[in-house]
């Protein structure tokens, strides 16, 4: 197991070295060498995961014999290594043809291999120093990959923007590592986490170390995972090559969720920080989802979609559902990587048409005409509201009867209910001669998905965090006052149902308030289309700082 763990980050590093050595001799054929070693990396990562599960192994720590330079083999590192290696291999294969006409072809694969090695080192790092080195290298490699086209000024500008944001995100993690080392005297994760569990209330300079470190780690994750208001770099990195966008949105941007899970033994003692994670994640999810709706560029729309999904991932951590955040991370990585790699084909196909999708969905949303409903709306509405909730409750109760004793689980159930209802509400645009059969097929598919997701979710939770006491402690730390919690859930449910009812009235060309809020809607659309002016505010602040530095420079010359 030890040798396999070291092979996983070393194979991409070896690939980068071979690409550099043989680029002049092999030319563009050097890409096949990179793909071959990438395939071997996937095989080794898969074998390690299977071996870990099959032998019922326990987490192990392996060092080179120094204080740093160690790897940690546990469920989180094992499964993340396979996911990262797999996505990297897909991007490598896709890039062979996509980048063939671009300048710097061998250099691109060299950087891609170095990026893969950095991410694999991060997910397998066994101590604070190794983690910081890998964390820093990811930002550097991403800067060079985004600026692959050196002749494009927007690419260089937004690559530097990303680089600065990532450097700002590095600083809190460095401070957290220093605080943890100064307080507990250890940098390797097994020793560090055991000492934190033994003395979670330790302080340094009058500050609670665990809470302060968790807060700093959260700030670092916010910058890396594009949480509001540190999100502006993500949608503007689309000037880079599409394979880089796929790797970034499928793997690199997920680093925030990984780092929070890696420091779960710290967050379990930080109730207030978990609540902050939930609030920031919820705001990011809402802002990202709303901004996505007003974009007319497919890659930028996918970028804001990623922002929203990262918000959901951080929100799940804030609820104490750390394992679900990892599951979300993996599913989103595979899904979003596929969407980015296929975005070019979608643009190509769209050019063959007039750009107007002549279907009932377009008629309902854009032309504001009534959608034809074959069944009474009241029946459909009741079935849509009740059936998903019933299926979710039964599935979770069957798998884990104590599931509903945790507030975080209730919130997850709430969002699952909203998602299921949204799926059923969206089926009005499907073309089916028999609407009853269509509805039954949708309900059956939804049931299978939910039940499968429930079983997989609970099994995944038991795999990542096998200690039931630790899982319960995470949920307990994320809890709030029961009366406040019940009131918030009830209020949110009322708001959601009111929104659905407004959608129904809009589909009937009616409105509760008539046209009195037409100007408000137009203003709101303008605000959203300008992305809430956050990027403009940052530009203005940058100009203010530049002007202030110039004045300060002139003032210093006089003295």
UniProtKB/Swiss-Prot annotation:
Annotated Pfam families: Proton_antipo_M, Proton_antipo_N
Subcellular location: Cell inner membrane
Organism: Halothiobacillus neapolitanus (strain ATCC 23641 / c2)
Residue spans crossing the bilayer: 4-24, 33-53, 76-96, 106-126, 173-193, 202-222, 240-260, 273-293, 310-330, 375-395, 408-428, 440-460, 487-507
Gene Ontology BP annotations: ATP synthesis coupled electron transport; electron transport coupled proton transport
Name under which the protein is recorded: Probable inorganic carbon transporter subunit DabB1
A single cellular component GO annotation: plasma membrane
The encoding gene: dabB1
GO MF annotation list: NADH dehydrogenase (ubiquinone) activity
Taxonomic superkingdom: Bacteria
Signal peptide: none
Subunit structure: Forms a complex with DabA1.
